[in-house]
Amino acid sequence: MNYLNIYNLLIEKGLNRGNDKSLLTYYTETHHIIPRCMGGTDDKTNLVLLTPEEHFTAHLLLFKIYRLPKLALAIRMMCYSSDGTRLNNKMYGWIKTAVSSSISESMKEFWKDDDNKKYMSNARRNAGKPIYQYDLNGNFIRKYRCITDAAEDMSYSCSTSIKQCVDGKRKTAGGFQWKYYYSDNIGKPSRMSNATKQKMSKSKRGITQKRNVPVFQYDTTGKLLRVFPRIKDAAVSVKGCMSNIKKCISGKSKIAYGYVWAYS
């Protein structure tokens, strides 16, 4: 079978439709005709709009033609759902189109609600609100301009954890207490019950096993850059959150901090 001929016909079909998304009434994705891992650029002449099914098929054809590991990685990123279920091109297309449409409609409804507008307005204000760092004995350490600054300073921590702490949803984050207000001493965090401690211990054991699995870091072309002994080391290297890297590994996002991540 002449895979190159089939690929060229598929690309020609997409080019004949045009590359103006505003003129198309259905969901499409941008595809690099010559893959970036093979020297392709982001120039408009190297781009074509394809349906999700066509996009998936195009990557399969490229791999069948050239048999490059980097092309295989691109397919791997496309053909697995977040729970590890393998998808064929029809299922992939249906899911991508359905999700895109669903998100678009839900966001339209979201912004119609005055309570949601108020919530987002408050969230934006809190994002730039000063926060105060305390040790576990309640002693004041320092003030940060906002949660983002605190998270960047503590490369092993995460802004989400700090946000949960200042909102009262958790006691500590990164080995510290965090508040929206200043005090010389806020006291020690309240003690947890034995039942809660046991529950957290069981949860941490499971998390630790997953975190000790080697993590592979790739650039966006599929080139292997580094191998980290565990996910925590990977997060520290990019001054990011383990949760964002895990989302990339599980397929919930394609990249995290400018890289592709995988367990193998």
Curated annotation (Swiss-Prot):
<dbReference type="InterPro" id="IPR036388">
    <property type="entry name" value="WH-like_DNA-bd_sf"/>
</dbReference>
<dbReference type="GO" id="GO:0003676">
    <property type="term" value="F:nucleic acid binding"/>
</dbReference>
<comment type="similarity">
    <text>To phage T4 mobC and mobD.</text>
</comment>
<dbReference type="InterPro" id="IPR010896">
    <property type="entry name" value="NUMOD1"/>
</dbReference>
<dbReference type="Pfam" id="PF01844">
    <property type="entry name" value="HNH"/>
</dbReference>
<dbReference type="Pfam" id="PF07453">
    <property type="entry name" value="NUMOD1"/>
</dbReference>
<dbReference type="InterPro" id="IPR003647">
    <property type="entry name" value="Intron_nuc_1_rpt"/>
</dbReference>
<keyword id="KW-0255">Endonuclease</keyword>
<protein>
    <recommendedName>
        <fullName>Probable mobile endonuclease B</fullName>
    </recommendedName>
</protein>
<dbReference type="InterPro" id="IPR003615">
    <property type="entry name" value="HNH_nuc"/>
</dbReference>
<keyword id="KW-0378">Hydrolase</keyword>
<dbReference type="InterPro" id="IPR002711">
    <property type="entry name" value="HNH"/>
</dbReference>
<dbReference type="GO" id="GO:0008270">
    <property type="term" value="F:zinc ion binding"/>
</dbReference>
<dbReference type="GO" id="GO:0004519">
    <property type="term" value="F:endonuclease activity"/>
</dbReference>
<keyword id="KW-0540">Nuclease</keyword>
<feature type="domain" description="HNH">
    <location>
        <begin position="25"/>
        <end position="50"/>
    </location>
</feature>
